[in-house]
Amino acid sequence: MPLSLTCPFVSRIALSSSVAMVLTLTVLVSPVSAASGPSVEQATQPTGAQDFREPDFLFSWPRTYVGVAGGWLATSQRGGIFDLTRDLLTVEDGDFNSGVARFAIGRALSRRFDLSAEVGFSRATVPSEYLDFLEGDLPITQTTEFAQAPVSATVRMWLVPRGRMVGRFAWVPAAVAPYISGGVDAHWYRFTQFGDFVDVVDLSIFSDTFESSGWAAGAHVAGGISAHLIKQLFLTVEARYGWGATPLSNDFVGFEDIDLDGLQVTGGVEFVF
């Protein structure tokens, strides 16, 4: 009798061959998977370059700095031309207060003392009109400008050092360092009034410009703090009071010296190197 192709013996042979093939593929694939596993893990691990952070210290004590600051100037506005301006015109106390900017470059003399050269600038512009006079039904208007630019030499003393040396080559900045300072000023100013005015003799109205400008010797004292931001950059906050006075020019005859005193409150940044 012919052999049937579907007999149990042949089926067992085919099944055994299939099982053997599956086992063989499993053995071959397993080493490849095992070998590829660590490679994936290694790819996800950070490299030394990714872990690098720039050190927050300097490799030497910084001896030079440049700085810029801005803030508010409250001028004293006492006496003389300021009193007359407030008496005749619609100008109030505090109208000559203004923003102020200052640039500095300095050099460390020692761990506790700096010497710097500074230039500041401020300008107030105040529109006004006469309090007691009209031109018909119209106000008599004018403008007063008061500009100042002190050029200063300043010595700054740190109450605690701005940083410390670690070993021979690393300088670590202090988080916060307070200081006091003082210096002398060559104080430039310009006081200008332009527009329409009333002649006190015959009460006639005329247009003109009156100006006084020049230099005055002065001085200042200050106190502040320096806070480390990043590496070579520091934030500074300072309060400063300055003194100065000088005679007015010939456009303003019979007045006492113009008062240049004022309080500055500023914030800024300094870059050390």
Region roles according to the model:
Residues 1-13:
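N-terminal secretory signal peptides that target proteins for export/translocation
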Residues 107, 157-165, 169-259, 263, ...:
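Outer-membrane beta-barrel transmembrane domain signature
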Residues 33-107, 191, 270-272:
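Short glycine/proline- and aromatic-enriched beta-strand/turn motifs that initiate or cap beta-hairpins
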